[in-house]
């Protein structure tokens, strides 16, 4: 497959993630220096899922992030359009001895055409996946459709570091060092070249907040993590 570009053709992006599914979590830990685990915990805290809540975790990959929700007693649907990622997640879940109190289901689905009824979930989360949606605003509108009135949206995504000298160093790492590490360690290094380019091309915090509002969400706010390398945006579906 040629090096991934920024056209975000669903078939190409899904195939790219299928190719790296087996080592996805390991490489995420390596390339983020372990920070990805802290980011996942922050998303779980901010989402605040309670026992009995229904959570949709989009772009769930191997369902690692979904376990943070079922640990609270919430029921979670982990949805991804990469069958390879879901299959890797299913294998790991089957091998786990510990069982969380909440139920977990894995579903293949496209964020632009979610296979769920209207107002089915108390919360919808998407971590490091909105960049990969061909039409992010349409995807956000679909997330709104499947969220109950008053329900919440949590978007965790790479963003813009707020300290300019630090951001300059980070960009050099992102566009130079990270692809080289991936070339030496990953079976599909083009996936991580795509990662670097898609992060660099992604809107900053305030612009993303505007996109979320344009999709019909209200009370949009965000919290920076790791100096803004990652931002967690939170919003509500309006009542009525």
Which residues does each predicted region cover?
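C-terminal alpha-helical "lid/dimerization" subdomain adjacent to the S-adenosyl-L-methionine
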Residues: 11, 156-211, 215, 221
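Conserved alpha-helix/loop element of class I SAM-dependent methyltransferases that forms part
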Residues: 23, 33-51
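Hydrophobic beta-strand segment of the Class I
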Residues: 24, 124-125
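Short glycine-dipeptide loop
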Residues: 51, 147-152
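Class I SAM-dependent methyltransferase SAM/SAH-binding core
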Residues: 54-113
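A short acidic, Gly/Pro-enriched loop at the edge of an enzyme's catalytic core
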Residues: 112-123
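A short glycine-rich, Lys/Arg-flanked "PGG" loop and its adjoining helix->strand segment in the class I
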Residues: 137-149
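Core SAM-dependent methyltransferase catalytic element
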Residues: 218-240
């Amino acid at each position: 497959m040629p090096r991934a570009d920024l056209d975000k053709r669903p078939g190409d992006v899904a195939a790219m993630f299928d190719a790296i599914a087996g080592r996805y979590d390991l490489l995420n830990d390596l390339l983020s220096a372990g920070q990805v685990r802290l980011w996942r915990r922050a998303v779980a805290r901010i989402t605040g899922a309670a026992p009995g809540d229904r959570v949709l975790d989009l772009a769930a990959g191997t369902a690692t992030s979904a376990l943070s929700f079922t640990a609270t007693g919430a029921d979670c649907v982990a949805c991804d359009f990469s069958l390879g990622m879901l299959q890797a997640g299913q294998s790991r879940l089957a091998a786990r001895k510990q069982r969380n109190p909440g139920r977990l289901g894995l579903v293949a689905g496209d964020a632009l055409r979610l296979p769920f009824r209207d107002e089915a979930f108390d919360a919808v989360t998407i971590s490091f996946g909105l960049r990969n949606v061909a039409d992010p605003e349409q995807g956000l509108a679909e997330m709104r459709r499947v969220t109950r009135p008053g329900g919440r949206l949590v978007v965790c995504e790479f963003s813009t570091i707020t300290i300019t000298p630090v951001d300059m160093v980070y960009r050099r790492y992102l566009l130079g060092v990270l692809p080289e590490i991936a070339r030496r360690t990953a079976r599909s290094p083009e996936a991580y070249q795509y990662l670097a380019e898609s992060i660099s091309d992604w809107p900053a915090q305030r612009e993303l907040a505007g996109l979320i509002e344009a999709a019909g969400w209200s009370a949009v706010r965000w919290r920076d993590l790791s100096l803004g390398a990652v931002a967690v945006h939170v919003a509500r579906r309006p009542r009525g």
